[in-house]
């Protein structure tokens, strides 16, 4: 049985996408079902919308995030059976909930954890996105540290504030360049206060208040990231990235050590981007 979990999504548009996907599969598979239950239903294949993250006992007790509770239970009880995850796109991301494309992964949603069946792909899907791959930047000024939502599931439980402070301290040992930190818009002022508190005695560190990632990338020498999706924006813009997590989608073409900050690896982007275009599918294709 293939079970689609409607309540794994919060927004009505996302639930509708699951319903549409179910109808498409049901035309070919007699055992495709969809449920509005917030409990795991035994099945051969589970289909959910969105990633899952660890919740505290308090969150479980107060039922603060029923969709995450459901997805955690599915992951736990479903075991090693196939799990299909629909997530936000990797390329051509938009601000807001509705997207033209969605990432579809098997058993996970991150690099080196999920299976996307996208090795050595042709460039056709990438070309349809209308994206430009700028030449690797020969010169740049500042280092851009890419922050993430403090509660982001792609952190896999990592402490983003600790990562930011530790990363900047390491950078200060290896470069004299200005270090800019770009925060996630949903974090409020918490990380800005952390930057001020920890680096008030140096002018080398700056809290970046640019409105867009493109503005932040302007004249950047290199980025440092955990699993931020902005890593892909950076390499498209010609700015190399040093990811500190193997679950970052630019891991395969990048340096992995902050010691390389002055001469970061600039690997082949084209095949990576072609492959990533085959990890996401349009709403029309899913329907």
Show the residue positions of the predicted features.
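Well-ordered, non-membrane alpha-helical segments in soluble/globular domains
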Residues: 14-25, 60-72, 159-170
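Leloir-type glycosyltransferase catalytic cores
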Residues: 96-140, 251-287
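Catalytic donor nucleotide-activated moiety binding site of glycosyltransferases and closely related
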Residues: 5-8, 167-209
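Short loop/turn segments at strand-loop or loop-helix junctions that form parts
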Residues: 4-8, 49-52, 86-90, 140-152, ...
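Short, well-ordered secondary-structure micro-motifs within conserved domains or adaptor modules
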Residues: 35-70, 75-76, 223-226
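Active-site donor-nucleotide binding/catalytic segment of nucleotide-sugar enzymes
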Residues: 134-189, 273-284
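N-terminal pre-catalytic "stem/leader" segment of glycosyltransferase-like enzymes
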Residues: 1-53, 151-152
């Amino acid at each position: 049985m293939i079970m689609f979990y409607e309540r794994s999504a919060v927004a009505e548009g996302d639930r509708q996408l699951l319903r549409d996907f179910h109808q498409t599969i049901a035309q070919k598979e007699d055992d495709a079902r969809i449920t509005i239950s917030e409990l795991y239903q035994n099945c051969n294949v589970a289909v959910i919308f969105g990633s899952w993250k660890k919740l505290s006992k308090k969150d479980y007790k107060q039922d603060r995030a029923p969709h995450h509770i459901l997805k955690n239970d599915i992951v736990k009880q479903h075991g090693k059976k196939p799990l299909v995850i629909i997530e936000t796109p990797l390329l051509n991301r938009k601000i807001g909930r509705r997207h033209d494309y969605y990432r579809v992964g098997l058993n996970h949603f991150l690099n080196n954890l999920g299976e996307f069946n996208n090795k050595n792909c042709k460039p056709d899907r990438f070309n349809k996105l209308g994206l430009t791959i700028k030449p690797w930047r020969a010169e740049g000024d500042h280092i851009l540290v890419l922050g993430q939502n403090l509660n982001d599931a792609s952190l896999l439980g990592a402490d983003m504030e600790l990562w930011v402070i530790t990363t900047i301290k390491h950078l200060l040992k290896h470069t004299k360049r200005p270090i800019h930190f770009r925060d996630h818009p949903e974090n409020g002022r918490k990380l800005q206060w952390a930057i001020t508190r920890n680096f008030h005695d140096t002018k080398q560190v700056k809290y970046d208040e640019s409105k867009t990632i493109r503005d932040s990338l302007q004249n950047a020498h290199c980025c440092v990231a955990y699993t931020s999706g902005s890593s892909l924006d950076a390499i498209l813009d010609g700015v190399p990235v040093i990811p500190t997590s193997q679950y970052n989608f630019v891991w395969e073409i990048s340096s992995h050590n902050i010691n390389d900050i002055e001469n970061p690896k600039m690997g082949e982007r084209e095949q990576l981007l072609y492959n990533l275009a085959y990890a996401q599918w349009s709403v029309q294709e899913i329907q």
